[in-house]
Design a protein with these regions (language model features):
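Beta1-alpha1 glycine-rich phosphate/pyrophosphate-binding loop at the start
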Residues: 1-81, 182-183, 252-258
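Rossmann-like dinucleotide-binding core of oxidoreductases
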Residues: 1-22, 108, 115-255, 289-290, ...
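A conserved short coil-to-beta-strand element within the FAD-binding core of flavoproteins
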Residues: 82-98, 147, 287-307
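Glycine/threonine-rich phosphate-binding loop and adjacent beta-strand/alpha-helix elements that clamp
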Residues: 320-391
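Short beta-strand to alpha-helix junction loop
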Residues: 51-70, 82, 233-242, 267-279
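Alpha/beta-hydrolase fold catalytic core
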Residues: 240-313
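Short hydrophobic core segments
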Residues: 17, 87, 107-120, 155-158, ...
Length: 393
């Protein structure tokens, strides 16, 4: 998004502080098997940097990471970035009308501070008694241990969200047994993924306008979901059709009525994120999979325990327990004109004007700020809109 600022003023004194060793954010860090985007490739790219080479309708982690690295290089972003540099503290100095920023590589000041740490950057682990005693291997899906071979292992997967729904089908054939802890069932819809023919990619390269038209059509189709989510008449008539479709998928792919009942959400569709997958239900109905309808309550030296006290022997625990979008860690390190941190001001309920600026924090702008996430389309569109707003400011 810095590219938006630099296009208006190429000479702008812009410095990016990045704690990682490369650009890419979540697509650099999340390398678990099966990692891919649930937003169509046509939308999951910057308007100023169209990509004609997507090989699938939904980009894979490797494709998206390569795209982000290329755009950063071409837009001159990497030359303005201090990699391996973590933010320690940022304090507004009212006397000088500047931000005083402390990092792991020294201090600096800035007229404007932009917090673009993302909503899916810090993995969260549940506080489970006994984890410190577990003798096996455990890791979060966002910090996948590629050195640990899962072949023939007894694996416990904690969580059934957007990450688990991708990596579980990718590992289920390798493991001896998989125990899946599901605290809350999710609505699952088919993922309209398919390969993009080389002839189509060539057409996009030769005639960029065609790709723009396709992008516009996909965007318009996705925006129709908003009507179903927000308009009373549509909620009454359209959402039941969505739910009927999701129930149909569940009925066809899960023959066991008892398991099907446990996999059926007890809330209306769109109240939580709809998950997209073609192989989730077939994966978790395999003979070597047990679905436990409870949270993980404790761990032992050699296993995990459910809410009913049943223990399951496992060699490996994989946490698909998500991130901290409602409590971004950066909020603890940014202090405004009264010396209070963002976390203290928000007090567990983040809010910001347009999701971008917060009263009492002058010249601070948030990217992917509170309440700007989407349940139907591409966050990239939101980020570009925020970047344009910040550039204007």
């Amino acid at each position: 998004m810095v590219a938006t600022l630099l296009r208006d003023d190429p000479a702008a004194d812009v410095l990016i502080v990045e704690r990682g060793d490369d650009v890419g954010g979540t697509w650099r860090s999340n390398t678990y098997p099966g990692a891919a985007c649930d937003v169509p490739s046509a939308l999951y790219s910057f308007s100023f940097a169209p990509e004609s080479g997507w090989k699938r309708a939904h980009g894979t982690q490797a494709e998206i990471y390569a795209y982000l690295r290329r755009v950063a290089r071409e837009q001159g972003i990497t030359q303005r970035t201090m990699f391996g540099c973590a933010l320690r503290d940022a304090q507004w100095d009212g006397d000088r009308a500047r931000w005083v920023v402390s990092t792991s590589r020294g201090d600096l000041t800035a007229d404007v501070l932009i917090a673009a740490t993302g909503a899916l950057s810090t993995p969260t682990l549940p506080k489970v008694p006994g984890l410190e005693m577990f003798r096996g291997t455990m890791f979060h899906s966002a910090e996948w241990n590629h050195d640990h071979d899962l072949t023939g292992k007894r694996v416990a997967v904690i969580g059934t969200g957007a990450s688990a729904i991708q990596f579980v089908p990718s590992i289920v054939d390798k493991v001896e047994h998989l125990t899946l802890f599901q605290r809350t069932a999710s609505w699952v819809m088919p993922k309209r993924d398919h390969g993009i023919a080389s002839s189509v990619r060539s057409l996009y390269r030769r005639f960029p306008l065609i790709q723009k038209v396709v992008r516009g059509a996909v965007y318009s189709q996705k925006e129709m979901y908003v009507v179903g989510m927000t308009k009373p008449f549509a909620r009454k008539y359209a959402l039941p059709l969505f739910e009927k479709r999701a129930r149909s998928v569940l009925r066809k792919q899960v023959p066991d009525p008892e398991l099907r009942d446990r996999l059926t959400p007890d809330f209306a569709i769109t109240c939580k994120r709809i998950l997209l997958s073609n192989d989730w239900f077939p994966a978790i109905t395999r003979r070597n999979v047990d679905v436990v309808s409870s949270a993980l309550t404790s761990a032992t030296e050699n296993g995990v325990v459910d809410a009913a006290g049943n223990e399951y022997p496992v060699d490996t625990i994989i946490f698909g327990t998500g991130f901290t979008p409602s409590e971004p860690p950066v909020a603890q390190h940014v202090r405004g004109e009264h010396g209070r941190s963002l976390a203290e001001v928000w007090n567990g309920s983040p809010s910001a004007h347009l999701g971008i600026s917060v009263n009492g924090f002058p010249n601070l702008f948030l990217m992917y700020g509170p309440n700007t996430n989407l349940g139907h389309s591409s966050i990239v569109y939101m980020l570009e809109s925020q970047a344009a707003y910040i550039a204007d400011a």
